[in-house]
Design a protein with these regions (language model features):
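Hydrophobic alpha-helical segments
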Residues: 2-6, 115-121, 216, 220
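Short alpha-helical hairpin
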Residues: 11-35, 54, 182-191
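Active-site-proximal alpha-helical scaffolds that flank and shape metal-associated catalytic sites
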Residues: 69-176, 205, 209
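Secondary-structure edge/capping motif, primarily at the C-terminal ends of alpha-helices
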Residues: 61-65, 96, 122-126, 150-154, ...
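Basic/polar N-terminal segments that are highly enriched at the extreme N-terminus
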Residues: 1-8, 12, 223-225
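Long amphipathic all-alpha helical oligomerization modules
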Residues: 173-205
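Acidic, carboxylate-rich catalytic segments that either coordinate divalent cations
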Residues: 199-225
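Alpha-helical bundle segments that constitute or directly flank the non-heme di-iron/ferroxidase center
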Residues: 15-20, 34-64, 84, 134-144, ...
């Protein structure tokens, strides 16, 4: 039996956590079309605040990169997040009468802050590029997996108010980007010592668990918007 590539093995090991994400109240209600406006609006605000901080992981990645190719990877990640994810999110915010500039002073919720602190600490204190990628990959890869599953199980979700968001993350373009990032991570993790590989696995698992806490949090709307 052939061993799985490092990143594929990480994903396989964490699928039970991602399955739990899929079963959270927020995503279940999104899937069946009963998600409240308050919860969805709160998610959009929290996601906006989260993405601002998430971009800092890529900055740490650039400082740890040892080749121009690696630096371009982080630049492409940042560009993809800003250009691809922003379009739909900003349109939804506009429909709710919210501007991104107006919500930047709002605080992150504790679950988001804990998640971001975990990622930033892993990227800052890690030996190099591998740790940075392990910190940011669970968010990227799990989003693609979750929304593809949502669309496969309930195709009608694409016709709901949340359909544009679901289709963004379930799209072939997003999947191709995730595959490219996973390939870069695979290259960065090739030849790691057993101790460092174990640390990378621990980072990936911790961030997957923070993803679960994030989705659990989203079932309760913010009270400050």
């Amino acid at each position: 039996m052939t061993d799985l590539p490092f990143v594929s093995a990480l994903v396989q090991a964490d699928l039970p956590v991602w399955e739990q994400c899929l079963q959270t109240e927020f995503l279940q209600k999104m899937e069946n079309g009963t998600l409240s406006e308050g919860c969805f609006k709160s998610y959009l605000v929290e996601d906006s605040l989260y993405l601002r901080e998430y971009a800092k992981i890529f900055a740490w990645g650039m400082t740890k990169a040892t080749t121009m190719a690696a630096m371009r990877t982080y630049y492409s990640l940042l560009s993809f997040v800003q250009e691809n994810e922003d379009l739909t999110r900003l349109r939804y915010l506009e429909e709710y009468g919210l501007r991104e500039a107006d919500i930047q002073s709002l605080p992150l919720r504790p679950e988001s802050r804990a998640y971001l602190d975990c990622m930033i600490d892993a990227a800052r204190t890690g030996e190099g590029e591998a740790e940075c990628l392990m910190a940011c990959l669970p968010c990227m890869l799990s989003y693609g997996w979750l929304f593809q599953k949502l669309l496969q199980r309930s195709p009608a979700v694409k016709d709901t108010y949340y359909g544009a968001l679901v289709l963004d993350y379930a799209s072939p373009g997003y999947d191709a980007a995730c595959r490219a990032w996973a390939e870069r991570a695979e290259a960065a993790c090739t030849g790691l010592s057993p101790e460092r590989a174990a640390r990378c696995r621990a980072i990936f698992r911790a961030c997957s668990e923070h993803e679960l806490h994030f989705w659990e949090m989203c079932a309760t709307p913010r009270t400050d918007i």
